């Protein structure tokens, strides 16, 4: 089976986000939270077009809450709809959560450099 040439591949975008929760969420719970929020807001037919995939996660422990940053892949043209659905999520399995969108990027590398792990000279 041949690999599709770049001209025929579906264009993708990467959404950098941060999840703040009362307790630590596993990767499976986070995937479930993302899919549930998209399904509740847009329905099954629309959500199937998003082509969502959770690429990477970084965990940061703070005294007051657990923060997880991640990169979510979606199809180009649906970024705004995915971001709307993510910000609407506030509860999952009895745990309060808040999702903040950090930014949008065309590559995983630039999303990581800009939003997830900023360099030391970029500190305020």
Curated annotation (Swiss-Prot):
Reaction catalyzed: Endonucleolytic cleavage of RNA, removing 5'-extranucleotides from tRNA precursor
GO CC term (a single one): ribonuclease P complex
Subcellular location(s) of the protein: Cytoplasm
Signal peptide, first to last residue: none
Ranges that cross the membrane: none
Any one GO BP annotation for this protein: tRNA 5'-leader removal
One Pfam family in the UniProt entry: RNase_P_Rpp14
The protein's Enzyme Commission number: 3.1.26.5
Induction behaviour: Constitutively expressed (at protein level).
Chief location bin: cytoplasm
Gene Ontology terms, MF aspect: ribonuclease P activity
Keywords attached to this entry: Cytoplasm, Endonuclease, Hydrolase, Nuclease, tRNA processing
S-S bonds: none
Cross-referenced InterPro entries: Pop5/Rpp14/Rnp2-like, Rnp2-like_sf, Rnp2_archaea
Free-text function comment from the UniProt entry: Part of ribonuclease P, a protein complex that generates mature tRNA molecules by cleaving their 5'-ends.
Family: Belongs to the eukaryotic/archaeal RNase P protein component 2 family.
Quaternary data: Consists of a catalytic RNA component and at least 4-5 protein subunits.
Name the UniProt record assigns to this protein: Ribonuclease P protein component 2
């Amino acid at each position: 089976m041949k690999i599709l040439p770049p001209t025929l591949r579906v264009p993708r975008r990467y959404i950098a986000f941060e999840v703040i929760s009362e307790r630590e969420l596993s990767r499976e719970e986070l995937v479930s939270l993302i899919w549930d929020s998209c399904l509740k807001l847009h329905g099954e037919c629309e959500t199937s077009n998003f082509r969502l995939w959770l690429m990477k996660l970084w965990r940061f422990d703070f005294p007051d809450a657990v923060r997880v940053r991640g990169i979510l892949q979606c199809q180009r043209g649906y970024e705004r709809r995915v971001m709307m659905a993510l910000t609407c999520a506030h509860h999952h399995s009895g745990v309060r959560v808040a999702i903040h969108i950090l930014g949008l990027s065309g590559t995983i590398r630039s999303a990581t450099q800009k939003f997830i792990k900023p360099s030391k000279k970029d500190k305020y």
